[in-house]
Curated annotation (Swiss-Prot):
It comes from Mus musculus (Mouse). Disulfide bonds: none annotated. It catalyses: all-trans-retinol--[retinol-binding protein] + NAD(+) = all-trans-retinal--[retinol-binding protein] + NADH + H(+). Its EC number is 1.1.1.105. Substrate binds at S177. PANTHER family: EPIDERMAL RETINOL DEHYDROGENASE 2, PKSB. It holds the Pfam family adh_short. It is found in: Endoplasmic reticulum membrane. This is Epidermal retinol dehydrogenase 2.
């Protein structure tokens, strides 16, 4: 009898907490969730030399964060450093680092800890795309894609998570992709690496919860194509439902998600619906929807980022 009462009690507590969490979510759809203050926080951004990484750096500069900029391209990263100073950042530190190389990550991470301090917001943003069909993609390019888009996240967490745990304070941000949610023709290696990055970030979120490390937050970002040049030549058949995203808009949404400690951010919002449909519809129906949205052909014109001359 006592065991049955305990089971009923646990069920009622579970239902009560579930109801409260749903009501809280509904409330924050009506009013904006409070945003945390990141002034003085040490924010490390990989791939800060261009595109999304640079724009994120400039936004955090305006918010008063201490910036740690990593990029494999020293010249581009130095340019971001200068722009961040002009945007009002009090302290900016730029480091040249190839995040695909584990030992280099650990070496530069040690340098950051000595020269700047404990990183409290880590944004794994660096990424590359080959844009080739699987059988046309050289093995070394596929390996590089995995090294940058996924394995670098492992080394970055290994380097900076221990201090976050010790301080019970930190925020882990994974820039994944809509290609980490749904397979895309012509992006097999990219999709695989982004699926892996998302799965890893989600697993680490669960791990921090299981260990009651409440002060460590996670945000996982899955955007559709962004006009940064990385996916130059890619198209969308349905721009109303799946628009190619403006970089400034994307960065504003990412910053808001971080400041509100939002776990998942999909852009555009239609992606939430697509992921839901993928889980419940028959496969033939899903294929029809993908065909209607032009998913099979959106990368056929891919040219990728043009190198500056």
């Amino acid at each position: 009898m006592s065991q049955n009462l305990e089971s009923v009690k646990n069920l009622l507590v579970f239902l009560g907490k579930s109801l409260l969490s749903v009501l809280e979510a509904l409330l924050f759809h009506v009013i904006s969730k409070p945003r945390k203050n990141v002034a003085g926080e040490i924010v490390l951004i990989t791939g800060a030399g261009s595109g999304l990484g640079r724009l994120l750096a400039l936004q955090f500069a305006r918010l008063g964060a201490v910036l740690v900029l990593w990029d494999v391209n020293k010249e581009a990263n130095d340019e971001t450093h200068q722009l961040a100073r002009e945007a009002g950042a009090a302290r900016v530190h730029a480091y040249t680092c190839d995040c695909s190389r584990r030992e280099e990550v650990y070496r530069v991470a040690d340098q950051v800890k000595k020269e700047v301090g404990d990183v409290s917001i880590l944004i794994n943003n660096a990424g590359i795309v080959t844009g080739r069909n699987f059988l046309d993609c050289p093995d070394d390019l596929m390996e590089k894609s995995f090294d940058v888009n996924f394995k670098a996240h492992l080394w970055m967490y290994k380097a900076f998570l221990p201090a976050m745990i010790a301080n019970n304070h930190g925020h882990l941000v994974c820039i994944s992709s809509s290609a980490g949610l749904i397979g895309v023709n012509g992006l097999s290696d990219y999709c695989a690496s982004k699926f892996a990055a998302l799965g890893f970030a989600e697993s680490m979120f669960i791990e921090t919860l299981a260990k009651k490390q409440w002060g460590i937050k996670t945000t996982i970002v899955c955007p559709f194509f962004i006009k940064t040049g990385m996916f130059e030549g890619c198209t969308t058949k349905c721009p109303t439902l799946l628009p190619i995203l403006d970089p400034e808009y994307a960065v504003r949404k990412i910053i808001d998600a971080i400041l509100q400690e939002q776990l998942y951010l999909y852009m555009p919002k239609f992606l939430y619906f697509i992921v839901f449909l993928k889980s419940i519809l028959p496969i033939k129906t899903g294929i029809l929807i993908a065909d209607y949205l032009g998913v099979f052909h959106m990368t056929e014109g891919f040219t990728g980022q043009k190198k500056k001359t």
